[in-house]
Amino acid sequence: MAQRDYYDVLGVDKNASESDINKAYRKLAKKYHPDLNHEPGAEEKYKEVNEAYEVLHDKQKKAQYDQFGQAGVNGQAGFGGQGYGGFGGQGGYSSQGFGDFGDIFGDIFGSAFGGGRSRVDPTAPQKGQDLDYTMTIDFMDAIKGKKTDITYTRSEVCPTCDGSGAEKGTHPITCDKCHGTGVMTVTRQTPLGVIQQQTTCDKCGGRGTIIKHPCQTCHGKGTIDKKQTLEVKVPAGIDNGQQIRLSGQGEAGKNGGPYGDLYIVFRVKPSKEFRRNGTTIYSEAPISFAQAALGDKIRVNTVHGPVDLTIPAGTQPNTNFKLRGQGVPKINGTGNGDQEVTVKVVIPKKINDKQKEALVDYVKAGGGNISPQEKNFFERLKDKLNGE
C-alpha cells in the first residue's frame, strides 16, 4: 500500500515552521492515541502520524525527504511494524529524538514518561494559601480614603507543636512506603506496553512523613483556625473592583514556609449626587431661565466641598462645565481628576401675574421669535395666558 505524503499526514505545507509541525503533531497524537481513541483505524493513524513527525521534525531527515521522497528516508523512520514496544528504545516508539513527545504522554498519563513534570519536595517549606476578603465601602470613603478594622478567619501555625503536627516531645517519621518523597510508582499495562506512573502516596497523603502521635491541639494538621483583626488603610481614590494586597496575612505555610497574602477587594456603594468614571466625577446643577440668559455665579457641590461656578450669559441647557482638580485622587500618581457639571435649566410649572407680565414684555421686546411659526411666540403666549 502506498504511503501518504508526510506533509499531508500532519496537515501542514512544505514551508511549515518547526513550531507548526510540533503543534500539528501534538494535536493529532492526542486525537488518535489508542488509549484515548478506540475507533477502528485510530491505531494505524497514530502510527502514521508518529512516522511523519519523526521525519519532518528532524532537519536532516526532512531535507532528504524533500529531495528524494520516501526513498530518502526508507529504513530510517523507525516505525517498520515493530508495534508498541517499551519506551526504553527497544520498540518503535522511543521518546528519544521527539522534541515534545514526553510532554504529550505526560498530558495523558501524568508523570509516566521520562520522569514527567518535576514534583515539589513535600518536606520543603511551602508558602501558605492566599485569601480574599470583600470590603464594602461608601462612595465618599473611596474618594477620601479611611482606616477601618476587619475581622476574618485564617489558619495559623499551631502554638503547641510549632507546625509539626506531632505531639510535643515526638516527631513525624519518614513514610516507609514512599521513603519521604510523597509519591509512589504505579505500574500500568497499556497497548503501548508497561507504563510506570507516579501518583500521590496513599499512606502519607503526599506529605512524605507519618505522624504516629498527633498533637492534641491541632489534631495533626500543624495549623489551627483563628480569627484575625487587622486595621486596613483604604487608599484615597480606590475604585469599585480594585484590590490591595496585605503581605503575610493569608494562610499559614507548610514546613516552616511563609504565610500567604490577603487580598482585599473593594465594593463601592453608589452616590445619589455624584457619578464616577475613573478619576472623573459627574454631577448636575439646576439653574433658572434667568440665570441661563443673564449669567450668574452659583455654588455647586464637589467631592471635596462646595465651590463657585460661573455661568456665562446665554448658557444653553445641558451645557457641561469642567472643574479642574475637583475629581478623584489619582491612586497611582499625584493630583486629582476633574469634575464635570451639567447645568439643567429649570422651567417653572407655575408663574404669578408679575412673572407673566415680565415674560410678555420680554416677548414684546423681540425675545420670543426663535423659528418661523404660523403664530409667533407672542401670539402663542397670549393664547396660553388667555386659556385658548
Swiss-Prot record:
This is Chaperone protein DnaJ. Its cofactor is Zn(2+). SUPFAM superfamilies: Chaperone J-domain (SSF46565), DnaJ/Hsp40 cysteine-rich domain (SSF57938), HSP40/DnaJ peptide-binding domain (SSF49493). It comes from Lactobacillus gasseri (strain ATCC 33323 / DSM 20243 / BCRC 14619 / CIP 102991 / JCM 1131 / KCTC 3163 / NCIMB 11718 / NCTC 13722 / AM63). It is found in: Cytoplasm. The keyword Metal-binding applies. One of its GO terms (biological process) is DNA replication. Homodimer. Participates actively in the response to hyperosmotic and heat shock by preventing the aggregation of stress-denatured proteins and by disaggregating proteins, also in an autonomous, DnaK-independent fashion. Unfolded proteins bind initially to DnaJ; upon interaction with the DnaJ-bound protein, DnaK hydrolyzes its bound ATP, resulting in the formation of a stable complex. GrpE releases ADP from DnaK; ATP binding to DnaK triggers the release of the substrate protein, thus completing the reaction cycle. NCBIfam families: DnaJ_bact, PRK10767.1, PRK14276.1. The lineage of its organism: Bacteria, Bacillati, Bacillota, Bacilli, Lactobacillales. One of its GO terms (cellular component) is cytoplasm. Residues 5-69 form the J domain. Zn(2+) 1 binds at C158, C161, C215, C218. Binds 2 Zn(2+) ions per monomer. CXXCXGXG motif repeats lie at residues 158-165, 175-182, 201-208, 215-222. The J domain is necessary and sufficient to stimulate DnaK ATPase activity. Zinc center 1 plays an important role in the autonomous, DnaK-independent chaperone activity of DnaJ. Zinc center 2 is essential for interaction with DnaK and for DnaJ activity. InterPro entries: DnaJ (IPR012724), DnaJ_C (IPR002939), DnaJ_domain (IPR001623), DnaJ_domain_CS (IPR018253), HSP40/DnaJ_pept-bd (IPR008971), HSP_DnaJ_Cys-rich_dom (IPR001305), HSP_DnaJ_Cys-rich_dom_sf (IPR036410), J_dom_sf (IPR036869). It holds the Pfam family DnaJ. Zn(2+) 2 binds at C175, C178, C201, C204. Coiled coil: none annotated. A zinc finger (CR-type) spans 145-227. Belongs to the DnaJ family. The keyword Signal does not apply. Keywords: Chaperone, Cytoplasm, DNA replication, Metal-binding, Repeat, Stress response, Zinc, Zinc-finger. GO terms for molecular function: ATP binding; heat shock protein binding; unfolded protein binding; zinc ion binding.
